[in-house]
Amino acid sequence: MKQYLALCERIINEGVWVENERTGKRCLTVINADLEYDVAANEFPLITTRKSFWKGAIAELLGYLRGYDNAADFRKLGAKTWDANANENSAWLNNPHRKGHDDMGRVYGVQGRAWAKPDGGVVDQLRKIIDNLSKGVDDRGEILSFYNPGEFHMGCLRPCMHTHNFSLLGDTLYLNSFQRSCDVPLGLNFNQVQVFALLSIVAQITGHKPGKAYHKIVNAHIYEDQLPLMQEVQLKREPFPSPKLSINPDIKSLEDLETWVTMDDFEVTGYQHHEAIQYPFSV
């Protein structure tokens, strides 16, 4: 929690004003932020200086791991995060690759589970990683990448958190996650939860102990209309201790994740928080 607040302070003190063409708003920006999460100690990085939500983040992650390409499937899991991008993005609505209502195209999990090969067929990156790690194998290339520039035109959105690199040292599994851009007041809580949960889940189904997860953000920013609430409200609050994340121990394989797992299989305990803050969202 303290590293989150330290990043917010750094952006305010050191950030450079950048005009964002997509949103038409200015944002204070810093380049390169490194966060780490102690998954072994189960210090779940849920923001405590405002009421924050975690279920949608894990539900979205589960949809990625299943390779979903339809917003309706994400809604069934409990994540509404793809509704607007799938159905309200004018460029995507007019894209000939869009298959209809709720279609997201070849984004995120599709790339992770079915990366198209130039000579035909697909690569299931996640399956390869799980198979290797389950055998105790780390080939120094246990990488799950959603970033495929050759197919950006076939999806509604480029990935922000785009690459996850797993590493095995003895019986302890580590994760390095890479993110190109982050709206820190709104988006980082979501991203932190996903990085932490991804390492927890993969360690559990491959039979390893989780170590630390390392989260690199390239472009970390706060929008101009978010600054007053960040400076005058959130940064003046004292953080509470981190809560804990529990995952159903019966989840033991990728097939379990693909078939029967729901949000009822995850629980957060010990979550103390301040009141919610309604930060402006930039579309």
UniProtKB/Swiss-Prot annotation:
DUMP binds at R22, R180, S181, C182, D183, N191, H221, I222, Y223. Pfam families: Thymidylat_synt. Its EC number is 2.1.1.45. Its main location: cytoplasm. One of its GO terms (molecular function) is thymidylate synthase activity. GO terms for cellular component: cytosol. It is an enzyme of class 2 (transferase). It comes from the Bacteria. The keyword Methyltransferase applies. Keywords: Cytoplasm, Methyltransferase, Nucleotide biosynthesis, Transferase. It catalyses: dUMP + (6R)-5,10-methylene-5,6,7,8-tetrahydrofolate = 7,8-dihydrofolate + dTMP. It is found in: Cytoplasm. The active site is at C160. One of its GO terms (biological process) is dTTP biosynthetic process. Pathway: Pyrimidine metabolism; dTTP biosynthesis. (6R)-5,10-methylene-5,6,7,8-tetrahydrofolate binds at D183, S282. Gene3D superfamilies: Thymidylate synthase/dCMP hydroxymethylase domain. Homodimer. Belongs to the thymidylate synthase family. Bacterial-type ThyA subfamily. NCBIfam families: PRK01827.1-4, thym_sym. Catalyzes the reductive methylation of 2'-deoxyuridine-5'-monophosphate (dUMP) to 2'-deoxythymidine-5'-monophosphate (dTMP) while utilizing 5,10-methylenetetrahydrofolate (mTHF) as the methyl donor and reductant in the reaction, yielding dihydrofolate (DHF) as a by-product. This enzymatic reaction provides an intracellular de novo source of dTMP, an essential precursor for DNA biosynthesis. This is Thymidylate synthase. The lineage of its organism: Bacteria, Pseudomonadati, Pseudomonadota, Gammaproteobacteria, Alteromonadales. The gene is thyA.
